[in-house]
Amino acid sequence: PDYILTVETKGIPLAVMVARAFNKPLVIARRDSKVTEGSAISINYVTGSSGRIQTMTLTKRAIPQNAKVLIIDDFMKAGGTAKGLTELVHEMNGKVVGTGVLVATAEPNPKLINDYESLFTFHGIDESTNEIHIEPVFDTIDR
């Protein structure tokens, strides 16, 4: 990838580490635009988890045309944020080369986006025992 993209705020620490690993610049989409950042592209997207309409904004100079972009986020329920980020990259005339998330929920399935990788799958919380049911997606990691 040429750029690593995430949305503020919770995905930033993970995206910082990915950007450092790839030695690529990190771009952060905002939920609102800042006048000091210059002209921007904004899109409205529907969150997959709550079905609410939210806004996502990226300055026009953040990602050049034809840039290859890797999307990183911390958590995916239905995939609405990842889909919104994908649409934002397309509006910037960039190409999404992959989407990675730390944790994705098992349900709903399918998600609003098809092509993503997650490290863990969240199956739920057993309220009677307060146990969190989460499992790694990969059984082994090549070293």
Regions found by a protein language model. Give the residues of each.
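Conserved acidic residues
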Residues: 2, 67, 97
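A short helix->loop->beta-strand "cap" motif at the edges of active sites that frequently abuts
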Residues: 22-24, 93-94
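Short Gly/Thr/Asp-enriched flexible loops that form oxyanion-binding sites at enzyme active sites
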Residues: 13-22, 86
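Conserved G/P- and acidic residue-centered "switch" motifs that form tight phosphate/ATP-binding loops
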Residues: 74, 79
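Short glycine-rich phosphate-binding loop at a beta-alpha junction
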Residues: 1-8
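PRPP-dependent phosphoribosyltransferase catalytic core
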Residues: 86-143
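Short, ordered loop/turn segments at secondary-structure junctions
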Residues: 9, 31-33, 102-105
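Short, glycine/charge-rich flexible loops or terminal/linker lids adjacent to PRPP-binding catalytic cores
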Residues: 23-69, 136
